[in-house]
Amino acid sequence: MELGHAYSVLVVSASAKFNESVRGLLPERFYWPVTVLTDAAGARRELLENSYDLVVINTPLPDDFGMGLAIDVCASSGAGVLLLVKSEQYNDVYAKVVGYGVITLSKPTNRQMVAQNLRILCATRERMRQMQAKQATVEEKIKEIRLVNRAK
């Protein structure tokens, strides 16, 4: 994977085993900083103070299932979100979050699937960056046109 920069990652999971495993999939040269939190409330506070490129949520969380957090992150930021849910809940959760842009992965899973989904999120994040850059350019041109029109 060749990148010009590293992706900031927020991992939200109550499982120490999962947290250790996912950290092994996030080498610093591609993913930095990596912040690990164990509950939705802490994640919400963190997201108010810092922005992240990728958010990985391993459900359930001790204070919230995690689906609402995933939806909120997608609705309020450009971060890519990976939501891991038990296989018996996958179809219901997927149907509720796909419209917001959340990528859902059923558990149990393996390291390769998580790694592949993280790469998909990186590609999606790059696409989002390109769109944001184009939008900024268009907005700047609109400002210039308005300024010229006022001068006339």
Where are the language model's segments positioned?
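Conserved phosphotransfer microenvironments
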Residues: 19, 43-44, 54-74, 88-89
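C-terminal output helix
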Residues: 109-118
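C-terminal output/effector regions of signal-responsive regulators
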Residues: 136-152
